[in-house]
């Protein structure tokens, strides 16, 4: 019975729960890796050994957080749980494929861990650039295992994307048009389209790298007429949409949370929000070379990528100001989920501002591969994506489990996390502006102060992670059941009680649209 339910599940709620659990465990692995990085950088001098092991940890940290924490939780966890409930579908369009999407992830994770255990590990950075990732600089199986890991994670995401696109377009009630679906459903749909279009390009790039390493091809080897810059173009054509894949479902969740705790029945500017997400998705595909300003592109190419990148700030601004307009005049409830959402809006905006700075190719020549870039993308990921996940988790936890988290603990947790991540990443702007380069395990003494502050901040964040584990334990131990849910009229995922029955919407829903 247990095996049938959890190994062969075709139920979107069970699979969503599996994704959430997997993402939580992977998140703890990723956090452990990040603390190793900060421990190494907490003081000048070596701690762990050589730069190879340091770079293996950095590479693993990135892959674990992106492919095994953020994507499984946002798309697999919240997506699976909420999309069918929000559109009134009985399940996903392809329930068995849904199960396969999940079960491809543990083997993929295993291959990634194996890559760091054999030989010297893959110390390439998450970009896996040749010639460093070639079979001279990285002899042995490490990089090959990493490539296979990415293949599996990629197949998992592509199958999931097909499933979500089909479900969202095809499984709404007949009376419901696409423009009446909630914003979270829209965000998952757009994310799925981005995955479907970008991942095959990554697959092509890393497969060529695999044959370069093992079958004597020369796609990226100038000696045989290849070009390492080709790899960079292929990688970043995936890599840039990927960062929007990581944040878009978060946008959807934040829209729901802000609307809910402002006491509003709908977000401000629904169509503007949809249009903004579609614009961000489209523009995300035509700005990839801003990651490559230092490889020597023509001045007109650099001018184009600079301006195209800056244009993304417009739809992003539409979203930020629409969230603020949703808050305006509302009956604001200062719940933990609302705190996460407000923290998201503020810190994501800060991360966006440093992104505008980096979009300038002339400035990026100086700031590329410094800690300024690290600070920028950790503000939008560690305080954008993660804050959205935390906000979504404390908001929908009663729906998933039927139990309530302790409000006071949840607010303390938010406060500790807020202090921790800011103390970790704000000083990195100063380090970057002072020229401290990324991906080195040691640094000149001049950089000591801010690195020490940054490392202290990371340990504050660690206490927040541990507190969250305690909070979840406390909720299941105390078993405070959900009495009543407000605003069910506009949030139909809450309509069937907490938690909802194993099968919801077994008969097609009758929808009256006003």
Swiss-Prot record:
Residues binding O2, per UniProt: 244
Catalytic activity: 4 Fe(II)-[cytochrome c] + O2 + 8 H(+)(in) = 4 Fe(III)-[cytochrome c] + 2 H2O + 4 H(+)(out)
Residues at which heme a3 binds: 376
Names of required cofactors: heme; Cu cation
Residues binding Cu cation: 240, 290-291
Membrane topology per record: Multi-pass membrane protein
GO biological process, one term: electron transport coupled proton transport
Mitochondrial matrix side: 1-11, 87-94, 171-182, 262-269, 328-335, 401-406, 479-514
GO molecular function (one): metal ion binding
Pathway: Energy metabolism; oxidative phosphorylation
InterPro entries, per the entry: Cyt_c_oxase-like_su1_dom (IPR023616), Cyt_c_oxase-like_su1_sf (IPR036927), Cyt_C_Oxase_1 (IPR000883), Cyt_c_Oxase_su1_BS (IPR023615), Cyt_c_oxase_su1_dom (IPR033944)
EC number: 7.1.1.9
Residues given in the record as Na(+) binding sites: 40, 45, 441
Any one annotated GO CC term: mitochondrial inner membrane
Location(s), subcellular: Mitochondrion inner membrane
Chain ranges on the Mitochondrial intermembrane side, renumbered to this chain: 41-50, 118-140, 213-227, 287-298, 358-370, 434-446
Function: Component of the cytochrome c oxidase, the last enzyme in the mitochondrial electron transport chain which drives oxidative phosphorylation. The respiratory chain contains 3 multisubunit complexes succinate dehydrogenase (complex II, CII), ubiquinol-cytochrome c oxidoreductase (cytochrome b-c1 complex, complex III, CIII) and cytochrome c oxidase (complex IV, CIV), that cooperate to transfer electrons derived from NADH and succinate to molecular oxygen, creating an electrochemical gradient over the inner membrane that drives transmembrane transport and the ATP synthase.
Family: Belongs to the heme-copper respiratory oxidase family.
Subunit structure: Component of the cytochrome c oxidase (complex IV, CIV), a multisubunit enzyme composed of 14 subunits. The complex is composed of a catalytic core of 3 subunits MT-CO1, MT-CO2 and MT-CO3, encoded in the mitochondrial DNA, and 11 supernumerary subunits COX4I, COX5A, COX5B, COX6A, COX6B, COX6C, COX7A, COX7B, COX7C, COX8 and NDUFA4, which are encoded in the nuclear genome.
Protein name (record): Cytochrome c oxidase subunit 1
Source species of the chain: Phoca vitulina (Harbor seal)
Taxon lineage: Eukaryota, Metazoa, Chordata, Craniata, Vertebrata
């Amino acid at each position: 019975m247990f095996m049938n339910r959890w190994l062969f599940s075709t139920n979107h709620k069970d699979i969503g729960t599996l994704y959430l659990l997997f993402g939580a465990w992977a998140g703890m692995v990723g956090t452990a890796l990040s603390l190793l990085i900060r421990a190494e950088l907490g003081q000048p001098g070596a701690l762990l050994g050589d730069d190879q092991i340091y770079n293996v940890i950095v590479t693993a940290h990135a892959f674990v957080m992106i492919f095994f924490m953020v994507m499984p939780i946002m798309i697999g966890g919240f997506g699976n749980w909420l999309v069918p409930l929000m559109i009134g579908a009985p399940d996903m369009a392809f329930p068995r494929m849904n199960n396969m999407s999940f079960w491809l992830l543990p083997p993929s994770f295993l291959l990634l861990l194996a890559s760091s255990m054999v030989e010297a590990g893959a110390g390439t950075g998450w970009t896996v650039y040749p010639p460093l990732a070639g079979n001279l600089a990285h002899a042995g199986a490490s990089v090959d295992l990493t490539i296979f890991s990415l293949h599996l994670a990629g197949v998992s995401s592509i199958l999931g994307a097909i499933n979500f696109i089909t479900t969202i377009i095809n499984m709404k009630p007949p009376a419901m048009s696409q423009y009446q679906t909630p914003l979270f459903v829209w965000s998952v749909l757009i994310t799925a389209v981005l995955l479907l279009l970008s991942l095959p390009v990554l697959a092509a790039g890393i497969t060529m790298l695999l044959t370069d390493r093992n079958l004597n091809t020369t796609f990226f080897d100038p000696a045989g007429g290849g070009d390492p810059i080709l790899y960079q173009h292929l990688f970043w054509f995936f890599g840039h949409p990927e960062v929007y894949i990581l944040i878009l479902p978060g946008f959807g969740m934040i829209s729901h949370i802000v609307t809910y705790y402002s006491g509003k029945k709908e977000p401000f500017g629904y169509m503007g929000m949809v249009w903004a997400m579609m614009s961000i998705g489209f523009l995300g595909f035509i700005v990839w070379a801003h990651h490559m300003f230092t490889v020597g592109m023509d001045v007109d190419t650099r001018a184009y990528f600079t301006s195209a990148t800056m244009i993304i700030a417009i739809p992003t601004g539409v979203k930020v100001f629409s969230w603020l307009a949703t808050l305006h005049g509302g009956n604001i409830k200062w719940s933990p989920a609302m705190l996460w959402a407000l923290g998201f809006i503020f810190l994501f905006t800060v991360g966006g501002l440093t992104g505008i700075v980096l979009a300038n190719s002339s400035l990026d020549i100086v700031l590329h591969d410094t800690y300024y870039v690290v600070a920028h993308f950790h503000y939008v990921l560690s305080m954008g994506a993660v804050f959205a996940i935390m906000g979504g988790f404390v908001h929908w936890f009663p729906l998933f489990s039927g139990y309530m988290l302790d409000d006071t603990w949840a607010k303390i947790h938010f406060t500790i996390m807020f202090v921790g991540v800011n103390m970790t990443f704000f000083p990195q702007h100063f380090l970057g502006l002072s020229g401290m380069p990324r991906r080195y395990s040691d640094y000149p003494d001049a950089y000591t102060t801010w690195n020490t502050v940054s490392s202290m901040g990371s340990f504050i964040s660690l206490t927040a992670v541990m507190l969250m584990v305690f909070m979840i334990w406390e909720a299941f131990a105390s078993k405070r059941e959900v009495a009543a849910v407000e605003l069910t009229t506009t949030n139909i995922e809450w309509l069937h009680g907490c938690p909802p029955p194993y099968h919801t919407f077994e008969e097609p829903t009758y929808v009256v649209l006003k």
